[in-house]
A protein has these predicted regions:
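N-terminal low-complexity, Pro/Thr/Ser-rich intrinsically disordered segments
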Residues: 26-35
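Intrinsic disorder/low-complexity segments
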Residues: 18-27, 62, 66-69, 73, ...
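Helix-loop-helix
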Residues: 2, 11, 15-17, 21-23, ...
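Intrinsically disordered, low-complexity regulatory regions of eukaryotic regulatory proteins
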Residues: 25, 200, 206, 503-506
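Soluble non-transmembrane domains of integral membrane proteins
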Residues: 33, 39-270
Length: 515
């Protein structure tokens, strides 16, 4: 009875303790600090440095690094220390959004930062040189999408048109470097197309396997690309400033992880089409987001996901549990058959199948649920990784501030290991020591080995596995009780039948003696 109580008690304590994480969190404000001519901006996912010298973006540092990712500086020519966040800049580097051309100002004045919304920050840089007045407005959001919106307002007070170039950076082609990609009419490539061969220029940027640094161009803009004598490729977009007019250009920079759903959300889905694995994950991610919107907490979303999964798989798991329990109870008979027919494997297999048929069990019945649950586990793992930004910005659960990162205290790792050991103990309650010794100890060692090698997996995955294993162990306990009760009833019936036969034999003997 103690076994049966331990599992629901652990699950109940987990649910009650998680109640504190039910409420949604308020929008997080963006922090900033003005240091000399620079302003440093910190969001939940990245760190930025803007400068009044050119009104440029000098650094985009991805400090949030979920499992399988690493911190990264995206601006060419900038190096960021992961510990101190101190920056070093290459001499002569071209920073994103520097404006070059006829009379473009080199120095700007930073206005007072404003907050259009609690989780937004608006920076405005104003510069003037001659007849050109330039205003650059950067809008940052504390969300999961790594975007910086830019509005460039060009006022030309002169009598001549001005040709301007808005640069995203410089690029030195070399092995292992990021790829320079242009997008025209929704198709990405490394070449700049002739003006007459496309309808719209969508943008330009740098891509590697993990990150994307891509500028969505303003409507009607044209690509810009120049190769310097040193071999550097300067790239960006061209802007027109007609005489006596004020023009406004709206652009958007995506500087973040290379994740299809994030990029699709900001209109860059065609830049990186998902593979088969990503397509399989999309429904799982969308379902998790649906549960999150219902509960406002990814911890509860994972709990509901686990419960729904266990309910759907209940018939299969029930059959698996019965099959495994019966198999354990048949071990003595199986061993006798194997010893008896060890010299004739064909006959041994025939006798084993006869025993399985007599007991009404299929030795392969336990495989199907395992084959179904493993892909679910893998898909959930990938879904948590691909939803890491949303999870990072959501409220914490229990002691876990971020379910996309590892458990800092390894509590879930230890609990899951203990529940797995308990489940293994429930699976081998009747096996004789000689038969089950190696199997039993292997079953106890495996959870420990798993914990040692996978301890740094996302806490959300450990939460799912803990709940799923706990529910499976509870279900196995109930199956063991059902089978034990059935065997007791069968044994009682057999004993009663035996007593009846003995009484019948005794009566026949008395009759014969009387005759």
């Amino acid at each position: 009875m103690r076994k049966s109580r331990s599992i629901p008690v652990c699950l109940l304590l987990l649910v009650l303790a998680g109640a504190a994480g039910w409420a949604g969190s308020a929008d997080r404000p963006i922090a900033y600090e003005v240091v000399g001519r620079d302003i440093r901006v910190e969001t939940a996912l990245a760190s930025y440095v803007f400068s009044a010298d050119g009104g440029v973006l000098k650094s985009v540092y991805l400090g949030f690094a979920p499992y399988g990712s690493s911190v990264a500086e995206l601006v060419p020519g900038t190096r960021t220390d992961p510990k101190t966040r101190d920056r070093q800049y290459v001499a002569g580097a071209i920073f994103p959004f520097v404006l070059e051309g006829d009379g473009a100002p080199a120095s700007y004045v930073l206005g007072e930062p404003t907050r259009p919304a609690p989780s937004e920050l608006l920076l405005e840089f104003r510069g003037q040189a001659g007849d050109l007045v330039i205003v650059k407005r950067y809008l940052l959001r504390n969300d999961a999408y790594y975007t910086v919106d830019l509005e460039v307002v060009v006022e030309n007070r002169g009598a001549k048109d001005a040709a301007l170039r808005l640069l995203l950076g410089s690029y030195l082609p070399k092995p292992g470097a990021r790829s320079l990609v242009y997008q025209f009419d929704g198709v990405a490539g490394e070449d700049v197309l002739a003006e007459a061969s496309y309808r719209s220029f969508d943008g330009v940027g740098l891509l590697d396997k993990q990150t994307v640094f891509f500028l969505k161009a303003a409507p009607g803009a044209a690509p810009f690309r120049v190769t310097t004598p040193a071999g550097d490729v300067q790239f960006g977009t061209s802007l027109a400033a007609k005489a006596g007019t004020t023009s406004s250009y709206e652009l958007s920079l995506y500087g973040g992880r290379r994740r299809f759903l994030l990029m699709e959300h900001v209109g860059l889905g065609k830049l990186d089409a998902p593979g088969i694995g990503a397509r399989l994950m999309i429904p799982v991610i969308q379902f998790l987001e649906l549960l999150y919107r219902a509960t406002r907490n990814f911890g509860w979303a994972i709990i509901l996901f686990t419960l729904l999964t266990r309910i759907i798989l209940f018939p299969l798991v029930q059959k698996q549990s019965h099959s495994m329990a019966k198999m354990q109870r048949l071990q003595p008979q199986l061993k006798k058959l194997q010893e008896r027919f060890k010299d004739d494997r064909q006959l041994m297999q025939q006798k084993l199948m006869e025993l399985y048929k007599k007991e009404g069990m299929n030795p392969l019945a336990g495989c199907l649920p395992l084959l179904i649950q493993l892909p679910i586990l893998i898909l959930l793992w990938k879904a948590i990784l691909y939803s890491a930004e949303q999870i990072h910005l959501s409220p914490g659960f229990l002691w876990l501030s971020d379910l996309s990162l590892m458990d800092p205290y390894f509590i879930l790792v230890v609990l899951t290991t203990l529940v797995m050991i308990l489940q293994q103990w429930l699976l081998t309650p009747t096996m004789p020591g000689e038969t089950s010794g190696s199997q039993k100890y292997l079953g106890y060692i495996f959870p420990v080995v798993m914990a040692v090698f996978l301890y740094n997996f996302p806490a959300g995955l450990w939460l799912y596995y803990f709940l799923s294993t706990g529910l499976a162990a509870g279900q196995q306990f109930l199956v063991n009780r059902q089978l034990a009760h059935a065997e007791a009833v069968r044994a009682a019936a057999a004993a009663a039948a035996g007593e009846g036969e003995e009484k019948g034999d005794a009566t026949d003997g008395e009759r014969q003696a009387g005759n």
